[in-house]
Regions:
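Substrate-binding cleft/loops of secretory-pathway carbohydrate-active enzymes
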Residues: 80-101, 107-147, 170-173, 202-210
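Aromatic- and carboxylate-lined catalytic core of secreted/periplasmic carbohydrate-active enzymes
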Residues: 221-281
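An acidic-aromatic loop/edge-strand motif
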Residues: 15-17, 28-33, 55-56, 232, ...
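Catalytic-core region of carbohydrate-active enzymes that cleave or remodel glycosidic bonds
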Residues: 7, 98-99, 135-232, 236, ...
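Active-site mouth of glycoside hydrolases
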Residues: 1-103
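The substrate-binding groove and active-site-proximal loops of carbohydrate-active enzymes
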Residues: 1, 30-50, 74-85, 127-136, ...
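Edge strands and adjacent loops of beta-rich recognition modules
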Residues: 276-311, 407-422
Length: 422
């Protein structure tokens, strides 16, 4: 599309993309592999090679060196905020070289020395760029000092200038003043080059939102990726767009600018829900039971996102029973005989749930929701990235056995039988 519009492109094909995307772009099944991602481990690199066998051949014909519009290729993504294994970066580069990449490479990291040292390949003459959203003078000066340390007189570029920010559940929508943003962008372009992140807001469709790591609590991000960008989620110009346009006109009056295209959007009204059905009523039409002695995680059952229902039967040993879900993630709803008894979230999971036992044999259902895997930082390989129940469920002091497990990715509603009971 960019080529058709006469635009050049900078492509960032790393298997890790961050981008507030589920698991930073990695497939969930990698969590079953026992490998250390973003390292030089053979198992991981073999998977990257398989991925590049498909992806890179789609990129090669579009390189500038082949008459296309791709100017540069990124090696990894903010690797200096994760590791410092130079052999890994070289391996990623070599995998792309072996498959026909001929345009220049670059790296992008935070603009301070620690991340630049850890994540760059400056001694191999691979362009170093920085990611930031303000204080261009300070950040470019830091990058210049790093360049000088290595004897480089290189151009300065902010590869990700954060003109807005992503949003998380339970938090206020992040706002940024349009005029302040325009002045911050001016500070960048007077010293170097800029790539706005994001220029056009978007959507993390379905269950593909990412999650932020904060200590023992993870903070799921919302589905919208509007980001407060100059073009909003619908593709229409915002106040930021016009503020940037005005700044460019005042700073670079010779640059020709055109009025942006706009499109009509739908007025949001109440949308009535026509169909409804109980999950328990339609369970057998949307999923097949996987029988196991103990609960398995979502990943071990071959599922990546959505929900998973664990079902078993328990005997009445007392008028009230103490139940506990051991090592579950992210949100757990416990039902006894299809009646909700408790909802627990993240660190609450594992606390005692005292339930009345009305009959000799009781049906126990535990519905677990994957609310998004961490996409950035130190918890990419944490146990909490594995969703569902990791250890088991206890009644009194013993683990309950003999479970039916129902995978509920809910990627389609075609098999939902809405004629059944609500």
């Amino acid at each position: 599309i960019a080529e058709e519009l006469g635009l050049y492109a900078i492509v960032r094909p790393s298997p890790y993309i961050c981008a507030e995307w589920e698991f930073g772009g990695f497939p969930a099944w990698l969590l079953n592999e026992g490998t250390r991602i973003r390292t030089n481990e053979t198992v991981y690199l073999n998977h990257v090679a398989d991925y590049y066998d498909v992806l890179i051949k789609k990129i090669v014909p579009h390189q500038l060196t082949n008459g296309g519009n791709i100017l540069m290729i990124q090696i990894e993504n903010e690797y200096g905020s994760y590791g410092e294994e130079k052999d890994y970066l070289r391996s990623i580069r070599d995998l792309m070289l072996d498959r026909g990449i001929t345009v220049p490479f670059f790296t992008s990291d935070g603009p301070w020395r620690a991340t630049l040292r850890a994540g760059s390949m400056i001694d191999e003459d691979i362009l170093v760029t920085g990611n930031f959203g303000s204080k261009a003078e300070e950040n470019f000066s830091s990058m210049e000092a790093f360049f000088n340390e290595h004897g480089k007189k290189w151009p300065l570029m902010c590869m990700e200038f954060w003109d807005g920010w992503f949003n998380r559940w339970k938090e206020p929508i992040v706002q940024r003043d349009a005029k302040e943003l325009a002045e911050a962008i001016k500070e960048v372009v007077l010293r170097g080059s800029i790539n706005l992140y994001m220029f056009h807001g978007g959507t993390n469709f379905g269950f593909m939102n990412g999650c932020s790591a904060r200590g023992v609590i993870d903070l799921p991000q919302i589905t919208s990726y509007d980001y407060g960008a100059p073009l909003d989620e619908q593709g229409n110009p915002t106040e930021k767009y016009y503020a940037i346009q005005t700044m460019i006109h005042e700073t670079f009056p010779d640059i020709q600018q055109m009025e942006p295209l706009t499109k009509d959007t739908m007025e949001m009204k109440d949308i009535p829900l026509i169909d409804k059905v109980s999950l328990f009523s339609t369970l057998d039409t949307i999923s097949q039971a996987v029988k196991m002695k103990y609960p398995e995680t979502m990943e071990m059952l071959g599922q990546k996102t959505g929900y998973i229902l664990y079902r078993t039967s328990i005997k009445k040993d007392a008028e009230h029973e103490r139940l506990r879900v051991i090592d579950g993630r992210d949100r757990s709803q416990l039902f006894l005989n299809q009646k909700l008894q408790a909802t627990q979230y993240q660190t609450e999971i594992g606390e005692d749930i005292i339930v009345p036992m009305p009959q000799e044999d009781n049906q126990l259902d535990i519905l677990i929701e994957n609310m998004g895997r961490v996409n950035y930082g130190h918890k990419l390989l944490a146990d909490t990235q594995k969703k569902g129940i990791r250890t088991g469920v206890m009644a009194d002091l013993h683990f309950i056995t003999d479970w039916n497990q129902y995978c509920l990715p809910l990627e389609s509603c075609e098999k939902v039988d809405f004629s059944k009971e609500w």
